[in-house]
């Protein structure tokens, strides 16, 4: 996460409504619990050279077959991609992503193993669930070097194909505090959706304006794709992110779990809505 300033956040709640808010059919989801989320931080890969293979192994544990996982390389940047084809080929695509790289210091547990864990568990929840839209799960490389992975992916979308992309959900640095939306890195309608979903799920939620900050959502916003960044930082982030202190000990598993539940429900609501609803 490229950050300079962030607004205060509220205290993270220790519980959340355990039922997906979208009702019918939700029981077919494979929902993770906070203990399962927390277990993913028992062994965080601390070297960048280990991260991509660790991401692949995580998705395989979540049920992905080796044949479903693609490593897409453009200009020396590697992104891990899984495409889940929707039942309605003309209903559009949703990207859900998180960068897997880290800075040299620390283990990058908050920034951004938390995001990778979130999208992997969202994948498991939806793996056998029938969706309308095609969902593209992406672990982006080289975000810390300038959003390189997401920029290369967004640059690869042909101009006449951009309307096929309904939304991009970016998860970056959950686990320090309450779930938040980065207003200045997000589309207004997706900001409103995140707020609505949080209220329905009774998840503590807040807004932040990240002055001078940047995230992978920007790469897609620049191409006209509705995008949102969800995070969970507090005002203590400068003491943790990009330092030796960014370790699993700084991750609140409940906070990551709440972010996971929010993102999963957001994705499902986008899936059940026309693309135009979020543009």
Q: What kind of feature is each model-predicted range?
A:
Residues 42, 60-65, 121-131, 155-162, ...:
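Sec-exported extracytoplasmic/periplasmic mature domains
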Residues 102-197, 203, 209, 213, ...:
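Acidic/histidine-rich catalytic neighborhood of metal-dependent amide-processing enzymes
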Residues 1-8:
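Bacterial N-terminal signal peptides
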Residues 81, 93-97, 136-139, 166-171, ...:
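Structural recognition of the beta-strand scaffold that forms the well-ordered cores
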Residues 11-47, 84-86, 91:
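N-terminal hydrophobic or amphipathic helices/low-complexity stretches enriched
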Residues 177-279:
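Active-site-adjacent substrate-binding region
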Residues 32-85:
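A non-catalytic alpha/beta surface segment that caps or lines the substrate-entry region
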Residues 34, 38, 52, 56, ...:
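Extracytoplasmic/secreted envelope proteins and their assembly/folding machinery
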């Amino acid at each position: 996460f490229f950050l300079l300033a962030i607004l205060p956040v509220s205290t993270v709640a220790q519980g959340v409504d355990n039922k997906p808010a979208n009702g019918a059919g939700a029981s077919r989801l494979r929902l993770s619990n906070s203990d399962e989320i927390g277990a993913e931080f028992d062994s965080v890969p601390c070297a960048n050279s280990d991260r991509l293979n660790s991401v692949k192994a995580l998705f395989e544990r979540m049920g992905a077959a080796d044949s479903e996982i693609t490593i897409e390389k453009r200009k020396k940047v590697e992104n891990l991609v899984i495409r889940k084809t929707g039942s309605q080929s003309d209903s559009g695509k949703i990207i859900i992503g998180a960068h897997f790289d880290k800075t040299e210091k620390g283990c990058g547990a908050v920034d951004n193993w938390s995001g990778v864990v979130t999208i992997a568990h969202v994948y498991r929840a939806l793996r056998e669930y029938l969706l309308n839209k095609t969902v593209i799960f992406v672990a982006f490389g080289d975000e810390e070097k300038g959003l390189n992975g997401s920029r290369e992916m967004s640059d690869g979308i042909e101009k006449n194909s951009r309307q096929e992309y309904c939304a991009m959900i970016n998860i970056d640095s959950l686990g320090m505090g309450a779930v938040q939306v980065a207003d200045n890195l997000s589309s207004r309608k997706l900001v409103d959706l995140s707020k609505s979903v949080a209220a329905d799920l009774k998840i503590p939620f807040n807004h932040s304006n990240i002055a001078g900050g940047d995230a992978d959502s920007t790469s897609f916003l620049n191409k006209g794709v509705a995008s949102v960044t969800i995070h969970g930082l507090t005002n203590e982030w400068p003491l943790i992110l990009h330092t030796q202190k960014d370790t699993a000990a700084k991750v609140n598993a409940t906070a990551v779990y709440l972010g996971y539940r929010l993102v999963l429900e957001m994705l499902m609501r986008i899936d059940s809505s026309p693309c135009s609803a979020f543009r």
